Amino acid sequence: MGFLYIDGHVRAYHGKHTISQTFVARRHLAMPATTDYWINDRAGDPLLLITGELDASLTKAFPDLLREVRAAVGERQVTIVFDRGGWSPKLFRSMIRQGFDLLTCRKGKTRRIAERRFVHRRAKLDGHWVSYDLHDQPVRLLGGKLRLRQITRLCEDGDHQTQIITSRWDLRDIELAYRMFERWREENYFKYMPEEFLLDALVDYRIDPQDPTHTVPNPQRRALDKQIRTARADLADLERQYGAAAADNSEQHRPTMRGFKIAYGKLGQQLRTARERLRKLLDQRRQLPKRVEVRDLSEQTLVKLATERKHLTDLIKMLAYQAESDLMNFLRPHYPRAEQEGRTLLHELFATAGDIHVTEDELQITLAPLSSPHRTRAVQILCELLDQTATVFPGTRLRLRFAVRPPPLIGLAFPGTPAHRGAASAPSRPRNRTF
């Protein structure tokens, strides 16, 4: 549990109640939604789940998340891995003071590093070889008060560079880069669970009242921010035009500034109008508070979805996923394509018909063959491994015994070996009969 991955997962809401809006990245728009923050281990398996408060960004959710992590792991030193959504040097300093290490990607523009300064690294991690072109250096944030380590990866195209920030000085740069880019495991979890376990399903219709005094960013100010960005872009474009006209002005035709202003009076008027518009927008924004209370946003009562049943069903789904992952670990050494289709094989196994026979001390389960011989053989090995666990059926003293009926030697789905096919297709010889 040396590395824990934290990220938010947004659940869109399509019901009739009025709940807060959240930006849903996969739909590229803001809509009624709830954000759940998941904490996964380095294999991508879930450990903890916290439902975020109204309009809580990852940086604002971190204090609660860290308290839950500390309660779960005790005083052990763990490294928290997260994306740019949690970028905050002040947060980093607070995490380090609480005994956590951090690993994240740097946000914002940084100076490009010369390609010749990168070093090729190659190592075997988690059983497979990885290689990166890396540059390692110390950096200072918060005006030099916070010293961290920056590892930059040069991508294969030779153009893009990714900066990784960490407080870990004891590990090799290639291992830290590998752990950072292993975030795809958590992303895969967010993709897999809604499809296979209905993670985003609405499990009940209960609602809880939202705290009316809770503050959120002022939507009017947010709308003004958009207008100000547009006004600044328009002003910058007019200033470029006016500057270009001044640079190209011929002194033989217009030797004085007065003549230039008269000649470009229309453009000058547009420039002054744009400046005045920007000034008014900035004045309007200064008069608006940055945050407002929820009760001031709408006449409708803002509510939030109840979490008790949702968390209970999520817990059951987490356990089911963990059991599936444990079966994957049993299967992996005996099924070459386990990473690509191992879970698909397990889904077929779960839906396979079978026979149940009860004896005095055993519950014997014999499954039908799967869709292909190589899958059937893999499941046979899995059954043997499960038998070795000596698992007892809950509430009884019956030991579970698993088996798979062997596939038929000949058939459309199981054509058998060439020898079997030859034997089956060979004409039968007449038998000698004695009288």
Range-by-range predicted roles:
Residues M1-I39:
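Active-site-proximal, Lys/Arg-enriched surface segment
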Residues G2-R11, G44, Q77-W87, L102, ...:
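Short, conserved catalytic/metal-binding motifs centered on acidic residues
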Residues V24-V73, Q161-T162:
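Electropositive, glycine- and tryptophan-enriched low-complexity nucleic-acid-binding patches
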Residues T51, R93, R97-Y189, P194, ...:
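An anionic, glycine-rich sequence signature occurring as long contiguous blocks
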Residues A56-S57, A61-I113:
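Domain-level cores of phosphate- or acyl-group-handling catalytic modules
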Residues Y189-S250:
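Charged, amphipathic alpha-helical linkers/stalks
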Residues D234, L238-V292:
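Extended alpha-helical coiled-coil "stalk/arm" regions
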Residues T273-R275, K280-F435:
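C-terminal accessory/interaction regions of large nucleic acid-associated machines
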